[in-house]
Amino acid sequence: VGPMAEQVWLGTFHALAARMLRRHADLVGLSSDFTILDMDDQNRVLKQLMVADDIDPKRWPVRLLGGVIQRWKDRGLTPDKVGVAEAGDLANGRLRQLYEAYQARLLALNAVDFGDLLLHMLTVFRAHPDVLAEYHGRITHIMVDEYQDTNVAQYLWLRLLTGPHHNLCCVGDDDQSIYGWRGAEVGNICLLYTSDAADDLGR
């Protein structure tokens, strides 16, 4: 392939986001040696916070509340972006506050969960245009396979990373979407056509 191949960044969304986040961890209050928690550790942290806030884990199973928080992250929603109506009566009406406390505890532990890898990089890109511009200079062409299985956070990350080049190629089949249970939004295919960048991105 030649020496140019050494400049290619190849990996999953989360692997590439983790690579970026290690470089810019300080911008979100982490250090570069942060730990990525597995599901058991996530649930353990969340349960501790629930007990401290008098939220009964028997009435509100940890996996249920943790699943809702992860779905919010899959949609690119930080605690301040979650609407009151959307949180509803979950966790005695305090799920937004629990999400906020969970994020604060992860920062104190110098840890992230799977959803944070993209969520934190969305925060970095939006708050630090100089960092985003650096990646625009480094990454000029992007190709995504199995695009039908991307979630909203991945779509937003792509939109920001594509930047002024608009050199984005996505391969996907809406009939083959199998990860809806994990936050995948087959509607992301339609967003490529309806977004304000659609004419530049091509079809």
What are these regions, as identified by a protein language model?
Residues W9, T35-D41, G88-I189:
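Conserved helicase NTPase motor core
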Residues A25-D26, L46, C169-G172, S195:
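Short acidic (Asp/Glu) and glycine-rich catalytic loops that position anionic groups and cofactors
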Residues V1-G2, L191-S195:
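Short, conserved catalytic or adaptor-binding loops enriched in Gly and charged residues
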Residues V1-V68, K73, K81-E86:
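Conserved P-loop NTPase-based nucleic-acid remodeling module centered on helicase motor cores
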Residues Y193-R203:
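Single conserved hydrophobic/aromatic residue that forms the stacking wall/gate
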Residues P61, N167-L168, R203:
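Key residue(s) within conserved catalytic/signature motifs
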Residues M20-L27, W72-G76, H128, L161-L168:
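A short secondary-structure junction motif
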Residues A17-M20, S177-G180, R203:
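Switch/connector loops and helix/strand junctions flanking conserved nucleotide-binding motifs
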